[in-house]
Amino acid sequence: MNIDKIRQNIILKDGIYYFDWTASGLGYIPIEDEIRRMLQTYANTHSECSECSNITTNYYENARAGIKRLLKLQSDFLLLPCGQGSSAAIKKFQEIMGIYIPPATKMALNIDFDSIKKSLPLVIVGPYEHHSNEISYRTGMCEVVRIPLARDGGLHWGELDKILKINANRKIIISISAASNVTGIKTNLAMLNAAAKRYGAIIA
């Protein structure tokens, strides 16, 4: 795809410069046009009582199949769309893993999680996490360890391996961003996946 064509189709007021692409992309005219086209027949996906419902259901199922194909997922994988961005996806994951607890419930139970944290799951986060991928864990039923930066500005792999080795007998969840939205430095996901498999950890 031509970068100049991409720039021409970005929705942004003239004279404004945007530097947060890793976190949130801007509106893009071809995508917005496609959304407008789909909205012409938009309806509930859990209904089969109208042609519009069938059309929207097909959009949804085709999108799911496309994601699974692109990520090379097998039939034993499930996709759980949240519809409200990555922050909602993190919360959904925490609910499934038994980590998320509503603040009012936490206050009502009055449990001192610090006193039992070693019996809770260990969540490993990276040095360049968005707040939604760190603060929400710190308020949940888990212990959180943050891996520091290496000299090259990326993930400190030696420290990660050390933490994994020390906690090998615990339930471990690795929730590390694929890239820093400040520097743009990418995490080596193949190395991260290999480290997780070595110690039986789950990647969020």
Show where each model-derived region lies.
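Pyridoxal 5′-phosphate
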Residues: 1-204
